[in-house]
């Protein structure tokens, strides 16, 4: 049950970020906000894309 819930959440996230992804995503080391999911890698740690 946990797995399917996780993938559903992930899918929803990807849907929500598709627009910003298609315009431009930030590279590794770029400053980012965890809430905006704007990194190419998808991971934002300590204010930087990982």
Curated annotation (Swiss-Prot):
Location in the cell: Secreted
A GO molecular-function descriptor: toxin activity
Keywords: Amidation, Calcium channel impairing toxin, Disulfide bond, Ion channel impairing toxin, Knottin, Neurotoxin, Secreted, Signal, Toxin, Voltage-gated calcium channel impairing toxin
Cysteine amide PTM positions: 49
Source organism of this protein record: Conus bullatus (Bubble cone)
Family affiliation: Belongs to the conotoxin O1 superfamily.
S-S pairs: 25-40, 32-44, 39-49
Swiss-Prot/TrEMBL site (Key residue for inhibiting Cav2.2/CACNA1B) positions: 27, 33, 35
Tissue specificity as recorded in UniProt: Expressed by the venom duct.
The keyword Metal-binding is annotated on this UniProt entry: no
Taxonomic lineage: Eukaryota, Metazoa, Spiralia, Lophotrochozoa, Mollusca
N-terminal signal peptide: 1
Effect after changing residue 31 to A: No change in ability to inhibit Cav2.2/CACNA1B
Protein name, UniProt field: Omega-conotoxin Bu8
Regions crossing the membrane: none
Primary location recorded for the protein, binned into one broad class: secreted
Keyword match Transmembrane: no
Other observations noted: Shows very weak activity on Cav2.1/CACNA1A (27.36% current inhibition at 10 uM) and Cav1.1/CACNA1S (2.82% current inhibition at 10 uM), and no activity on sodium (Nav) and potassium (Kv) channels in rat DRG neurons.
Domain notes: The presence of a 'disulfide through disulfide knot' structurally defines this protein as a knottin.
GO cellular component, one term: extracellular region
Function: Omega-conotoxins act at presynaptic membranes, they bind and block voltage-gated calcium channels (Cav). This toxin selectively and potently inhibits depolarization-activated rat Cav2.2/CACNA1B currents (IC(50)=89 nM), when coexpressed with alpha-2/delta-1 (CACNA2D1) and beta-3 (CACNB3) subunits. In vivo, is lethal to fish and displays potent analgesic activity in mice pain models of hot plate and acetic acid writhing but has fewer side effects on mouse motor function and lower toxicity in goldfish.
């Amino acid at each position: 049950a946990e797995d399917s819930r996780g993938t559903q959440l992930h899918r929803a996230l990807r849907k929500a970020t598709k627009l910003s992804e298609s315009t431009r995503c930030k590279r590794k080391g770029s400053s980012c906000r965890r809430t905006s999911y704007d990194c190419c890698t998808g991971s934002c740690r300590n204010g930087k894309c990982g």
